[in-house]
Amino acid sequence: SAVGEPLEPSEIADAEAYVSALGFPDVSVAAVEDWRAAAAAAQAPDWSQDWWQAEEQMRKALLEEALSLNPEHDLMVALTHVSTKASEVSHGLAAVSAARAGVADEALIRVAAGAAAQAAYQAALVLAADGDAEHPFAVKFRLFEAGRLPLGIVGNTFNLF
């Protein structure tokens, strides 16, 4: 896990590409330094609902495209499997990372695992819709693969742990 470590230039570039492709080119990327700061960022009351809406619109469009290319039952089984496995794996990794930092906040660990499972679902949806490696959800998933936890946009900042 790279959470809490300084951001690599490639991670900053991916984060900037992700938020820009969602329609937020002026949002800056900020590193979140530890689990406690991550909890505060995740619970910020002024998180961007526009960011969430942009992701949701993109998800719906991808799902529509994926359903035009794949049988619905097969697609749903595959997406459920991806989400379930990602949740199982990421929960264990998040728990270990948090414990090493002296954090035992089970709710925060579940949030981190849920975010990873959602990113895996979104990346699988990109594949099912025959999207490319630079689709915003594929880029977001790369951040998770690098051991990062995108915490969303608060104000004019994309928080990356």
Go through each PLM region and give its residues.
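Short, glycine-biased loop/turn motifs at secondary-structure junctions and
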Residues: 1-161
